[in-house]
Amino acid sequence: MTTKVAANSAAYEAIVRAGPRVKQLQQVHAHLIVTGYGRSRSLLTKLITLACSARAIAYTHLLFLSVPLPDDFLFNSVIKSTSKLRLPLHCVAYYRRMLSSNVSPSNYTFTSVIKSCADLSALRIGKGVHCHAVVSGFGLDTYVQAALVTFYSKCGDMEGARQVFDRMPEKSIVAWNSLVSGFEQNGLADEAIQVFYQMRESGFEPDSATFVSLLSACAQTGAVSLGSWVHQYIISEGLDLNVKLGTALINLYSRCGDVGKAREVFDKMKETNVAAWTAMISAYGTHGYGQQAVELFNKMEDDCGPIPNNVTFVAVLSACAHAGLVEEGRSVYKRMTKSYRLIPGVEHHVCMVDMLGRAGFLDEAYKFIHQLDATGKATAPALWTAMLGACKMHRNYDLGVEIAKRLIALEPDNPGHHVMLSNIYALSGKTDEVSHIRDGMMRNNLRKQVGYSVIEVENKTYMFSMGDESHQETGEIYRYLETLISRCKEIGYAPVSEEVMHQVEEEEKEFALRYHSEKLAVAFGLLKTVDVAITIVKNLRICEDCHSAFKYISIVSNRQITVRDKLRFHHFQNGSCSCLDYW
């Protein structure tokens, strides 16, 4: 008996020494078979765990099948390992085999399987696992519930995530973080911020994971005050400014209009990775500082920084497009394909078309798309949308109409394409065609996306939509805006009304333009603050008239006004914009 135990122990030590290396594990396995230990449950379990760690899935399954009656320990080993290694399909498959073998799962089983369902975004399967956990008596287990909050969040079911969270008898910091992250990642930034406040009221102290999600939520909404408080908290509490936190702070300051502060954070980071470099390059690009973006990209290459990836190249190409750096953009695109052997995706192609089109190289941009067409890559609507924007900018209306019609053929239910075609017709004076397009949109119930603008005043955020009258001080805001526009007209402002429906009188067009959401937001901001810069976040692109008006408003108010629209930043000061009207 002693000899058998010693042999078993020696075999176990041999497996441990082999580690997660497939060839050595296979040699040990062969030795076990020869020496009569090939069906030892404990030894096979260890072999299976290490084989799975080596991602040798086929070999793992072969070993698993050699066990005559797998028990709960063995099933949990493979389920936990496949879940941890992000092999969700295999994890779910072993869970199903476990059930068919009449082996009872544990809380660890459910936690791992639910995580895999989250990785797959498999809402229906995950709900089934949730029901099974409840029936099995693990519905209120702390680990299972925390995994369920993450699962429902990743599947976009925040109502389900909130219900699970609210039923938790004991809420952990992990569960709170999952809920904050879930709301933020599903675009519900305000809800994420509210959950953070509830977390603090419940006596939980935030950690780095909390702040990464919270900073992203602040960046979405433009809540710079809360974001700055987080930064100060990190400093005062002596928290480590790790890569994730540093990158989140760069994104916060960038998206809230302070690219200088973003660079300060970047320069103070002890450790950086490709995500941090890309975030800083993107910050320069969206603010119109294309040359700085290219210089930082060159520094990344020359100073032995991290190897740029596809996202990095999107950031630098976009920066070149916004700043009119055509030669630099061509060079970057060439280096991407030749030096780094990266395959450009739709985003890179869109940047190239946008860059060439904005700069007036319409023929080259059009040729670029047709070269992609020959390889079957020109069906992406975003390519033609970028080309259409260039046609509108350079008043090539005939080509614009052709492209707009092509877009409508690709996506007939996208109201944005119909609106762009209508605008092209309006600019070219074809009022009958404008009416035809608008009537067609009405018949097909195609509605233009509602625009809104957000402004933060005294640590509170306020949202405005076009013609908004929901604010308590609507009357005062509208009167102040009237005065503001009148003062702007005295120094040369003239409303740009070409794109407003041509069936109405000029006075009505001006009225329609006057109450755009960003104008209401800037009027409110100027009313409620003194001698401070105004920052507005808009969900759509700023229109040509508002862009013109804001240059004049910056003069009459003697304020700096920053607008973050769908694509970039505009910094208005003393009658000019940082984009140099190149947008």
From Swiss-Prot:
It comes from the Eukaryota. The keyword Repeat applies. Residues 459-489 are annotated as: Type E(+) motif. The keyword 4Fe-4S does not apply. PPR repeats lie at residues 71-105, 106-140, 141-171, 172-206, 207-241, 242-276, 277-303, 309-339, 345-379. SUPFAM superfamilies: TPR-like. InterPro entries: DYW_dom, E_motif, Pentatricopeptide_rpt, PPR_At4g14850-like_plant, TPR-like_helical_dom_sf. Keywords: Repeat. One of its GO terms (molecular function) is RNA binding. GO terms for biological process: RNA modification. Pfam families: DYW_deaminase, E_motif, PPR, PPR_2. PROSITE patterns: PPR. Residues 383-458 are annotated as: Type E motif. Residues 490-583 are annotated as: Type DYW motif. Belongs to the PPR family. PCMP-H subfamily. This is Pentatricopeptide repeat-containing protein At2g33760. It comes from Arabidopsis thaliana (Mouse-ear cress). The gene is PCMP-H6.
